[in-house]
A protein has these predicted regions:
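Short amphipathic alpha-helical surface patches that mediate protein-protein
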Residues: 139, 217, 416, 474-477
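C-terminal substrate-recognition regions of SAM-dependent nucleic acid methyltransferases
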Residues: 45, 49, 170, 251-471
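Selective for proline/serine-rich intrinsically disordered segments
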Residues: 7, 177-178, 302, 365, ...
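Short, amphipathic C-terminal "tail helix"
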Residues: 470-489
Length: 489
């Protein structure tokens, strides 16, 4: 296998610059028009096959994050296991055409083009229509070359695709793609999170030191988490490898780029052990470059089973270090359903939810185990995690909220602070609901050492910098939800 050197990649954000570069990169206007036309996905195709065509600017932005040496190595093998019409490999083709132009033996444009198409690029696609479109586009690039694209199911247990390429190749150096997220349905229908299987099998295809370059949803950033339906801990798999780069996208930016309502990341994983596992000094650590959901760039030492937040990485790192030392605040998830089972109860009040209009109450004839106990009740469902201090133990609660029983003075200050809402939003990796993993970043603050009086003292205790404090005070990162302290049914 040809050795891939680990030079530092060039990093840029998706911007007008990337958009212009991706468009000018593709010289053939017919190909550019076809790709642009195919970006508009029919609803039926999206639901049945999970099709989402990746825009050129996103592909370009992702591809140039790879080490520069990959574009100058004519021996590397590239694969896209869910290639669609081939738009990702079209961008890769043009980048290789540019990168190999000064390499001896590949200076002739036609010969270079033929070599790239026949010996470097490999594609697997499930839909025959897409395969035909892909072959058509590569024929426009070089009509004497035979592209390596097969119509097959990459996830087929029999792995029939392995016998279908002409040279029977089964190992690759770069696996780049945007695999389907769901198949045979959207929302609550169909097979969910199928991208996890693509990612796991995709890593298995790689030679040592090869690269997985994938776009997919971000649950892999949650530590010790079995992804729904897939029942795999992708965090454990990725973080034990060397993660080169992560870029996060908001729901709004993903909608604009790919016309889907979800947040996604793209991630570059090198198929080698995480060097931080054995690092015995600061000189030996490896830091991953991360562009967070707010567009801020960070360097982070990723260790196995690490939670990777949406933003505020340096702040949450400090919080986690204190949590490891002092322990974390205990968040209670109730399993008591009596408030909804017993109808017509009038004796005991149970908080079912909190909105801006007030506190939603369910009544029961059976007391909750935390009735008559002082506690903090946090709205667990929805965008706003309202905090109610039940000082006199008036309420129980249903399955929707979460609670902190008998909070200490320092816990009260922390949970009622701006910092708490900053942490909650930084850890909302999936949807808008409260993430129980937030407790990783909610440290116990020992009252024997300090009694926190205000947020300034809290910031000083945590040793936050002026820049970090400004981030917490910045309303663009989160909102502090207010609600009427009135009971509603």
């Amino acid at each position: 296998m040809p050795k891939i050197k680990s030079n530092t990649p060039i990093y840029t954000n998706i911007s007008t610059h990337s958009n212009e570069n991706s468009k000018t990169l593709i010289k053939n206007k017919t190909i550019l028009e076809l790709i642009t036309q195919k970006l508009i996905i029919r609803k039926s195709e999206k639901e049945e096959y999970g099709e989402v065509f990746t825009p050129l600017e996103m592909i370009y932005d992702m591809a140039i994050k790879l080490p520069k040496d990959v574009w100058k190595n004519p021996q590397l093998k590239w694969i896209d296991t869910s290639s669609g019409i081939g738009n990702i490999m079209i961008v890769v083709f043009y980048l290789l055409m540019d990168g190999l132009k000064d390499i001896d033996g590949y200076k002739d444009e036609q010969e270079r083009s033929k070599h790239i198409i026949e010996n470097m690029l490999y594609m697997i696609e499930y839909k025959e229509e897409n395969v035909a479109d892909c072959k058509y586009m590569f024929n426009l690039l070089n009509d004497s070359a035979n592209p390596n694209i097969i119509c097959a199911d990459f996830l087929d247990r029999g792995e029939k695709w392995k016998t279908m390429f002409n040279n029977k190749i089964t190992k690759f150096d770069i696996n780049i793609g945007n695999p389907p997220y769901n198949i045979e349905g959207t929302k609550h229908k169909g097979i969910k999170n199928v991208y996890v299987a693509f990612a796991i099998k995709g890593l298995e295809l790689l030679n040592p030191d090869g690269y997985l370059v994938y776009i997919h949803p971000p649950p892999y950033r949650i530590s010790h988490h079995q992804i729904q339906c897939a029942k795999e801990n992708l965090n454990a798999i990725y973080t034990t490898k060397q993660i080169i780069y992560i870029k996060m996208f908001t729901v709004e930016s993903t909608k604009k780029l790919m016309n889907i309502m979800m947040n996604v990341d793209y991630i570059i994983v090198k198929n080698t052990n995480n060097p931080n596992i054995l690092a015995n000094s600061m000189e030996n650590i490896y830091e991953t470059t991360i562009t967070d959901i707010k567009g801020e760039t960070h360097k982070l030492k990723i260790i196995p089973h690490m939670f990777i937040p949406n933003f505020g990485i340096s702040i949450l790192k400090k919080l986690e270090q204190i949590t490891r030392k002092n322990g974390n605040i205990n968040i209670i998830l109730t399993s008591e359903k009596h408030a909804q089972i017993i109808k017509g109860g009038t004796q005991y009040k149970n908080v079912h939810g909190i909105t801006s209009k007030g506190i939603k109450i369910c009544y029961s004839d059976k007391p909750h185990s935390l009735h008559n106990k002082r506690k903090l009740i946090i709205n667990g469902i929805g965008s706003y995690n309202y905090v109610l201090y039940d000082e006199f133990g008036e309420f129980g609660f249903t399955q929707s909220p979460v609670a902190i029983n008998e909070p200490s003075p320092n816990t009260l200050k922390l949970i009622q602070s701006k910092l708490f809402h900053f942490i909650v939003n930084a850890t909302k990796i999936i949807g808008n609901n409260f993430n129980i993993k937030t407790t990783l970043f909610l440290p116990i603050i020992d009252e024997k050492k300090i009694i926190i009086q205000n947020e300034t003292e809290l910031y000083n205790y945590l040793k936050l910098t002026k820049k970090e404090i400004a981030m917490i005070e910045n309303k663009d990162y989160y909102s502090i939800p207010a609600f009427l302290h009135e009971e509603i049914n």
